[in-house]
Amino acid sequence: PTRRSSDLDLVGINMEGPFISPKKVGAQNPEYVQGADAAMFRRLQKRAGGLIKLVDVAPEEPGNLDFIKECHNEVRISIAHTCTDYDTAVKAFEAGATHMTHLYNAMPGITHRAPGPIIAAMEHDAEVELITDNVHIHPAMVRFTFNTFGDDRVCLIADSAMSCGLPDGQYSLGGQAITVKGPRATLTEHPDTIAGSNTCLYDCMKRAVLEMNVPLESAVRAASETPAKSIGVDNDYGSLAAGRYGNVILADKELNIKAVIQKGNRIV
């Protein structure tokens, strides 16, 4: 169908799987995991009309560094769902990766003898994502990340599952049963495994400010301008400037939404 100017935009697609580690699938279906395949990516990109803006890769898996080298000029590469060590992560960034998906989740942490992929990202100017639903990451780690990476490199994300906005209950995610209770979604058969988020991006931004003490201006930038730049759509989205779409949320001091303006037209 022809897209009208009043329609909400699908700006891009994150191909979070299947080029990930079978040991760090999180809530993804392990049956779908495979090595990175440039031909498969290009076939999907053609079907998507060029909308795939980000491809997630576990660089330690056989052949995946070669995929990064081959495809990084066609799409942005993000390190994700990985068991990679520091040295392999450095090789991935040197090969062309520029991004890290949901930092801290589904990856090795930081220790003084094994700094891991997080420190590699910090040293190589990568953008990093944070799920600020107050379930995935402790507020102190959120503040730490803003202080170390800066709001020009932090991208707030919701990582929301299809259950987002729906009542508590049982749902399906990638062919697996999930249980939703409040802001938390988990695999039904493995209740300690978080299955995405049940919170929208605006509420994640709101929680970062009101519950995690992130400065408002930093949280707003990390939810708009920085992610737009990270996937290359900042000529149209992410900030208010001449030539960009006039997409605005008006809120009160408690960040309750009062109006939504989409492409210059008030829709809420």
Regions found by a protein language model. Give the residues of each.
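Active-site core of metal-dependent hydrolases
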Residues: R42-D168
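Electropositive phosphate-/nucleotide-binding environments in soluble metabolic enzymes
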Residues: Q34-A38, E61-L65, Y86, T111-P115, ...
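Short, small-residue-biased leader/transition segments that mark boundaries at the very start
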Residues: P1-S5
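Metal-cofactor-binding active-site regions of metalloenzymes
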Residues: L8-Q28
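His/Asp/Glu-enriched, well-ordered alpha-helical/loop segment
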Residues: P117-E129, F146-A158, C164-A251
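Conserved phosphate-binding/catalytic loop of the ribokinase/pfkB sugar-kinase fold
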Residues: S21-G49
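Short, Lys/Arg- and Gly-enriched loop/turn segments at beta-strand edges
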Residues: E254-I261
